[in-house]
Amino acid sequence: MTPKAVIFDCDGVLVDSEEIAFDLLASDLATYGLNLPRATLEKELIGLTLAGVAAKARTLGADLPEAWVNDFYASLYARLEQGAPLVPGVLTVLDALDAAKIPYAIGSNGSPRKMQITLGQHTGLIDRFGGRIFSGQDMPRPKPFPDVFLHAARAMAVDPATCVVIEDSPTGARAARAAGMRCMGYAPHHTAGLLAEGADPFTSMFDLPRLLGLI
């Protein structure tokens, strides 16, 4: 069924920034004593807010200083300002949604500044969302709670049950399920975590217009 609205995660869905951020994160956590296999870190940390990452990393054994979140954000912003490419096929998806007159928004656990840095590198991209760019950090509860997705649905004046969420993390897929929304899981490499949270996986953004019933 064609959705009435689409809500995108940002990192790893619109902009190919997640690998950049995660490489920096893994290296940084190692300096504070957390040396775990990458697959374990991805399973435990991807999709969380940075405050959530810090809390989880401490439970896993990282000896993080009190100012770690702010310090890491400074390093991350500096790295992302060097360039964060779009996920291939994203503009094709937005063009198809525009042609079908289907509204869309962003619902991310990333900070507003982070999204401004990554999205703002691509001319006209922020404007295409018409102010509908929302951070879970501005909500009462971030993902895996549904607050940011429900807020986005209200902003577009659509029933949550008619929305589709595009996510790449189990945390985000869980939030979509809690919001009563269908989740399409962008999974070019690993699908198990998204499947476990009820997402419908796909591997290429170029396939998404067809999967959404737009063509």
Residue spans for each PLM region:
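Asp-based, Mg2+/Mn2+-dependent phosphohydrolase catalytic module
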Residues: 1-4, 95, 111-215
